[in-house]
Amino acid sequence: ELVALDHFNLTIEEGEIFGLLGPNGSGKTTTINCILALLAFDKGTVRVFGQEMRPDSYDLKRQIGVVMQNVAVFQELTVYENIDYFCGLYIRDKALRRQYVEDAIDFVGLNDFRKFYPKKLSGGLLRRLNIACGIAHKPKLIILDEPTVAVDPQSRNKILEGIQELNRNGATIIYTSHYME
């Protein structure tokens, strides 16, 4: 039986950028899934903002933005529609949501691509769309699982600069990578 995490303790302070660095298969994504209460574990607790995270911690989960390694967008929706859809899961007010979507498009630099469908985007632009979908609702905690995998160095640098800006704007960041950057 494979044990991915054993006697694992982790404290991340609000406002911090925390990196989980390790090779593929080392438990980074498993750790994220435990933090998000998507994966059951035998012992212990996970606390986010001082509250215990459980599968039904919906109010707490609204404060979290997640960008997983595998791009998860709808191919039949445009860039704008994808971001609007994911933001709408958290923000019901249409005017506020519209503003948040515009802010996310601006932030990731997809203004010229808002009417494009994902299949027309390069790998780097697709990653930026994935990030926009995860941050559009302006979460306090942003979890990014290998957000720069399989992108060119220029796109990687742009994504890393964006992550630092999100942190400067008050978000706590958990970032996984197998790159030593």
Regions found by a protein language model. Give the residues of each.
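Conserved ABC ATPase signature
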Residues: E76, Y117-G124
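Conserved ABC transporter NBD signature motif
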Residues: G44-P55, L60
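Catalytic Walker B motif of ABC-type/P-loop ATPase nucleotide-binding domains
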Residues: I142-D145
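Conserved ABC ATPase "signature" region
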Residues: D84, G88, A95-F113
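Conserved catalytic motifs of ABC-family nucleotide-binding domains
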Residues: K138
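Helix N-cap at the start of a conserved alpha-helix in ABC-type nucleotide-binding domains
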Residues: P153-S155, H178
